[in-house]
């Protein structure tokens, strides 16, 4: 099993471009099976490129895990003054400019888990001001050590749906999603380019082999405060792969609501533990993203994914869709084209 990984850079005239394209083999670590496993830490040899900066060359060298952690990241939430950083899901980079995708319900975890609130502000969603949400990116191990990370806060978030008013006095209104997909924007990368995964506009097919990659059951991270700065304690950040086959596709679920996952979605028979919500689901033999992990049935190999293709047509921050951004090239959104992709 492998994933097709691109390495992006910004040209001297400010255009995003792919500098490298390489397959990464995903092998189980010792003691794991082939349908659910922690990724073995194979070393990936660098591919030289004359226009690379030193930092980019460092990023192009390392283990399979270090490569993937540039593109697949844990979603975290910090409540002001709390003693730990909550790990609430997984996200993945979809543009070199700093767009990341996750499951929409991950962003409402503060409301659902009772440590924060989402407020109806004239039909828009506003979160409590004492909560910071974002993702963690690895820093180059040669300069900062093997487990150093950088917190990248969400600057803005976009999901699709509206407020559903509860008829019961004791229940709060809540967001009713059109699809379980959300896109968040980060500040520009300090080193030039984020490293996105390849997207597909094609729907997944029944009986297609797919696999999700995410931070299964990752523990919350202890924090302490030094001169007003947040310092993270020791933590483990391990990526897991869960392999399955699609069993049903619900393209018209927005109208029929035949399953509880909102919007166009599909079912697949894979083990999906907690904290993998928002993980990318890959198909096309690992070349492209087909969907986003939405939910799973506890203790069973039965999960649901939100389809990526239909979500690419929805309006984003400036009313342009993800498909529009693919065509323009202004954000560095990758799309790999070919038979079956």
State the predicted function of each range.
Residues 26, 198-237:
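Short glycine/Trp-rich loop-beta-loop segment that forms part of the substrate-binding cleft
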Residues 106-107, 216-219, 296:
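Short, charged beta-turn/beta-strand-edge "cap" motif at the junction between a beta-strand
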Residues 90, 96, 203-208, 277-278:
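Short, flexible surface segments
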Residues 68-84, 187-196, 226-328:
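Active-site region of chymotrypsin-like
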Residues 55-67, 79-83, 88, 114-192, ...:
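Conserved catalytic-core segment of clan PA serine endopeptidases
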Residues 98, 102:
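Cytochrome P450 catalytic-core helices
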Residues 8, 12-90, 103, 178-182:
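N-terminal activation segment of mature serine protease catalytic domains
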């Amino acid at each position: 099993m492998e994933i097709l990984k691109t390495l992006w850079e910004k040209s001297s005239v400010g255009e995003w471009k792919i500098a490298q394209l390489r397959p990464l083999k995903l092998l189980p670590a010792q003691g794991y099976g082939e349908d659910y496993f922690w990724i073995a830490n194979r070393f990936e040899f660098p591919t030289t490129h004359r226009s690379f900066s030193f930092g980019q060359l460092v990023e192009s060298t390392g283990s399979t895990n270090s490569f993937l952690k540039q593109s697949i990241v844990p979603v975290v939430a910090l409540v002001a003054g709390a003693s730990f950083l909550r790990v609430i899901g997984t996200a993945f980079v979809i543009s070199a400019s700093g767009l990341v995708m996750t499951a929409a319900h991950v962003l409402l975890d503060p409301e659902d888990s009772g440590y924060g609130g989402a407020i109806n502000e004239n039909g828009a969603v506003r979160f409590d001001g004492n909560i910071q949400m974002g993702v963690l990116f690895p820093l180059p191990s040669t300069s900062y050590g093997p487990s150093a990370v950088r917190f990248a806060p969400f600057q803005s978030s976009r999901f699709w749906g509206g407020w559903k008013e509860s008829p019961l006095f004791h229940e709060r209104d809540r967001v009713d999603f059109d699809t379980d997909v959300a896109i968040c924007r980060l500040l520009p990368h300090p080193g030039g380019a984020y490293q996105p995964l390849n997207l597909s506009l094609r729907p997944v097919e029944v009986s297609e082999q797919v696999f999700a990659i995410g931070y299964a059951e990752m523990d919350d991270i202890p924090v302490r405060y030094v001169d007003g700065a947040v310092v993270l304690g020791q933590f483990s950040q391990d990526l897991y792969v869960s392999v399955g086959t699609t069993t049903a596709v619900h393209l018209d679920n927005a109208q029929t609501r035949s399953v509880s996952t909102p919007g166009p979605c599909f079912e697949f028979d894979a083990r999906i533990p907690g904290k993998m919500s928002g993980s990318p689901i890959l198909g096309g033999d690992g070349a492209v993203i087909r969907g986003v992990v939405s939910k799973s049935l506890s203790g069973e190999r039965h999960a649901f994914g939100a389809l990526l293709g239909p979500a690419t047509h929805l309006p984003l921050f400036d009313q342009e869709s993800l498909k529009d951004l693919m065509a323009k090239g202004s954000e560095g959104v990758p799309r790999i084209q070919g038979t079956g992709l």
